[in-house]
């Protein structure tokens, strides 16, 4: 037999807040959900993401260990 009264209460009209504004009305086990960032204002999802990595990992490795074409041939 299934146990009674073990599941959390489900709220059909829970309010989802982002930066103090109601963004969505969703179903949740909490009455209110607060978030700093969500898909509606995240740079990746709205297309304003900038690539931060300006140099490649291989170039960084070579520079870090002072490897150049002359040194790599002797290895």
Swiss-Prot record:
InterPro entries per the UniProt record, alphabetical: Ribosomal_bL28/bL31-like_sf, Ribosomal_bL31, Ribosomal_bL31_A, Ribosomal_bL31_sf
GO terms (BP aspect): translation
GO cellular component terms attached to this protein's record: chloroplast; ribonucleoprotein complex; ribosome
GO molecular function: rRNA binding; structural constituent of ribosome
Protein name, UniProt field: Large ribosomal subunit protein bL31c
Coarse class of the protein's main subcellular location: plastid
Lineage, broadest ranks: Eukaryota, Rhodophyta, Bangiophyceae, Cyanidiales, Cyanidiaceae
Organism field: Cyanidium caldarium
Superkingdom field: Eukaryota
